[in-house]
Amino acid sequence: MAKAQKGARTKKKERKNIASGIAHIHSTFNNTLITITDTHGNSISWGSAGAQGFKGSRKSTPFAAQMAAENAGKKAMDHGMRNLEVRLKGPGSGRESALRALAAIGFNISHVQDVTPIPHNGCRPPKRRRV
């Protein structure tokens, strides 16, 4: 196994001065993923309910989505981001709480867009669950 050399220099993440970007909130029934990108789509920061330490059914809660959004938002603010455009995708319970969390930590939200994919009668859906 390779060992880290003593006194080896590690590359520090450089601060990108980006004023505005896009927050993609993907909320499923099981988890909530928040990715903050610049206007070209290059990823700046991300967070998810699972990455925050929530496991199992706790990942699908609005509180977990709020914590994930705060984490991703603070990382993006470290790069100088202040203005956000928000794109929501999916049917999950963490959509609104993630959006509120981003607004609460000081982002200027210009507009909110729902980009949930809706089929024009495409693939056959999975069969109904019988519990």
From Swiss-Prot:
Q: Which GO molecular function terms does the record list?
A: rRNA binding; structural constituent of ribosome
- Say which domain of life the source belongs to: Bacteria
Q: Which SUPFAM superfamilies match?
A: Translational machinery components
GO biological process terms on file: translation
Q: Which GO terms describe its cellular component?
A: ribonucleoprotein complex; ribosome
- Cross-referenced InterPro entries, in alphabetical order? Ribosomal_uS11, Ribosomal_uS11_bac-type, Ribosomal_uS11_CS, Ribosomal_uS11_sf
Q: What does this protein do?
A: Located on the platform of the 30S subunit, it bridges several disparate RNA helices of the 16S rRNA. Forms part of the Shine-Dalgarno cleft in the 70S ribosome.
Q: Which family does it belong to?
A: Belongs to the universal ribosomal protein uS11 family.
User: This chain belongs to which protein, by name?
Assistant: Small ribosomal subunit protein uS11
Record the organism. Magnetococcus marinus (strain ATCC BAA-1437 / JCM 17883 / MC-1)
